[in-house]
Amino acid sequence: MKFKEYDVIIVGTGVSGLYAALNLDSSMQILMLSKRELTLCNSALAQGGVAAVMDTSNDNYELHIKDTLIAGGYKNNIDNVRILVEQGPKDVKNLLNYGVDFDRKQDGSIDLTLEGGHCRHRIAHHKDSTGFEIVTSLIEGVKKLSNVTILENTHLLGLTKRGDDFLFDVLHEGKHSYYTTKNTILATGGIGRVYDYTTNSAIATGDGIQFAYNMGADIQHLSYVQFHPTAFADHENRECFLVSEAVRGEGAYLLNCNKERFMHKYEPERKELAPRDVVSKDMMKEQKETGSDKFYLDISYKDSEFIKNRFPMIYNKVLEKGYDMTKEPIPIYPCQHYLMGGIGVNGHGATNVKGLYAAGECAHTGVHGINRLASNSLLEALVFSRLIAEDINKNNTHRELGTLEADYPSPDGKPLPKGIRTEIRHIMPVSYTHLRAHE
């Protein structure tokens, strides 16, 4: 069969995939594969913002590095943390060139907010829908590139390697299409749909990690899974959606089943602004003490117009569920949110498989340690996808492209167990996964 050749194939069209495409040399022919429409990705769901040292009069790299290491339990890759923090501001500034509209102060400077685990105001944001703002801006930029082909609503049925060539079997519009490249970037996101309750989009199924594993890539620390302490709890409909870290950053209180503050008992200094894993664990301690799994988040003491203007998306979503966060506490509970482990990569996003790169949540750069600091995820997606692009650019041979004749390996014929995904989701309830086995 014939495989159409590309210089680079990017699987995934969130921030990592889009930003990589924008930083690749314009002489390269690039194919981007999206599982759904371009905006239906995890990146677009990110609310809080991008953490970076933008105000050097009040912040510095060492403070951001320290916060990242503390949140990560000092299990971080310090070299990659330094890359993340020191190169991050350049990429945040570059977003402005693509039209990203960060909230501004009256003097025109970027408004930097505070989130849990940070000792300084350093989160650039767009209301409470920063991810969507960044994704839509980057999409506009990519669509202007004549060297990039985007296929939406695709299903990657197969990805294997023969020599230096990656072979792709893609289902698109009901037909099989075959592609090949010597440079593959996996930007496929996380594993949220392995869990019953997750803040992730429906496409976060971990298939990119599986494809990498099948090709011999190192897979690292899959037990490093983060639970966000404040997901809106709709137990009746078995749904949850994220209530941004920034709500606590703006002063919201965590309340127990008696609608009493409790974080001061466990974190007398940081209280509600402790890192995510700490807050989630403390909520479990409080649940054990009270015998109830009911928790609330309360910012209703703040000015109602401030709440509506600062958190318009969250306000409207909880209002649809029957709660007015300007007048009352809203029910929340820890929910699966982010994978810190994944496909092992080095400081420029390369795996141990020649020509295979990984970026974003599917990759394990080690910058997050055992627990990600709030708003470091979009920063990681930007910095390391750019470094991947720079590495590919450096090794670009400017070869002629055409088609490759090859046989694609046939499926082994083994039927998939019916309902296995649903069964896995049901056996991983949130109460069993806040604490890892070794803890």
Task: Describe each model-derived feature in a short phrase.
Residues A52-L84:
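Glycine-rich active-site loop/strand segments that organize a redox cofactor
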